[in-house]
Amino acid sequence: MSTTGPITNYYVDSLINHESGDVIAAARFSAPGSHPAGPRPTSLVPECGDYPSCSFAPKPPVFSSSWAPVHSQSSVVYHPYSHQPHLSTDSRYMRSWLEPISGAVPFHGYPGNGRHYGLKPDAFPDHRAGECLGTNGRTYTDYLYCSSTDMRDKTQQNAPSPESELLTSGKHKEEKPELDPNNPVANWIHARSTRKKRCPYTKYQTLELEKEFLFNMYLTRDRRYEVARVLNLTERQVKIWFQNRRMKMKKMNKEKGDSKDQ
């Protein structure tokens, strides 16, 4: 019976380990409010009935606190819990962003000897080319640290004067190239009409034509040629003028007849 001690220890340890594992698994996977399941019967109990009972102090559980229930998923593989090592407590790597700097920016309207809050040197950089501006050319920092009078002065300085606007508009007009009307490649919208400009008659020519019209409303070809030569006009111009004058006279006579009937 000298081998009873080691064999008993082996079987007792195996029984204790199985029971503790069942308790932990039941506490982990059981729903809240449900009764814990009893220990699972093992096949080793009947075989150990011949050995005397021994009392051993139970081993402390591996994990001090019970785990929260985990939703079981078929596609997730269970990994045993491993305690993460504590992070280094070196003070060089902690709260570096809260360290105050000597050149902290004071707020407008508060005394300069007050408490300075930790700010990075590039917290309020100067205006750069890619920085967004407001509608009136002021940045966000101008609203924070400038008074109303300073903002009004900056707005007046940034506002363009009417003289500068006139100069810029004149420059744009001068830079616009003029299209050559004789150039066939020019756009047809900007092309000028090929029709001859209207050449109004002078007062002397109009007076002489009116006198001739009073003597005779219709001119012969010889008389038309003579009038055109004297007035320095073409026969076609004299003919058109007489045609227009006859139409005008008919219109005037018609208006007079309508006014009399009324």
Swiss-Prot record:
Keywords assigned by UniProt, alphabetized: Developmental protein, DNA-binding, Homeobox, Nucleus, Transcription, Transcription regulation
GO cellular component, one term: nucleus
Compartments in which it is found: Nucleus
Residue ranges for the DNA-binding region feature of this UniProt entry: 194-253
Entry's Gene Ontology BP terms: anterior/posterior pattern specification; DNA-templated transcription; embryonic skeletal system morphogenesis; proximal/distal pattern formation; regulation of transcription by RNA polymerase II
One Pfam family in the UniProt entry: Hox9_act
UniProt region (Disordered), positions on chain: 152-185
Example of a GO MF term: DNA-binding transcription factor activity
UniProt-listed InterPro entries: Abd-B_homeobox_TF, HD, HD_metazoa, Homeobox_CS, Homeodomain-like_sf, Hox9_activation_N, HXA9/HXB9/HXC9
Main subcellular location of this protein, as a coarse class: nucleus
Function, as annotated: Sequence-specific transcription factor which is part of a developmental regulatory system that provides cells with specific positional identities on the anterior-posterior axis.
Similarity remark: Belongs to the Abd-B homeobox family.
Name of protein: Homeobox protein Hox-C9
The species this protein was found in: Oryzias latipes (Japanese rice fish)
Designated gene of the protein: hoxc9
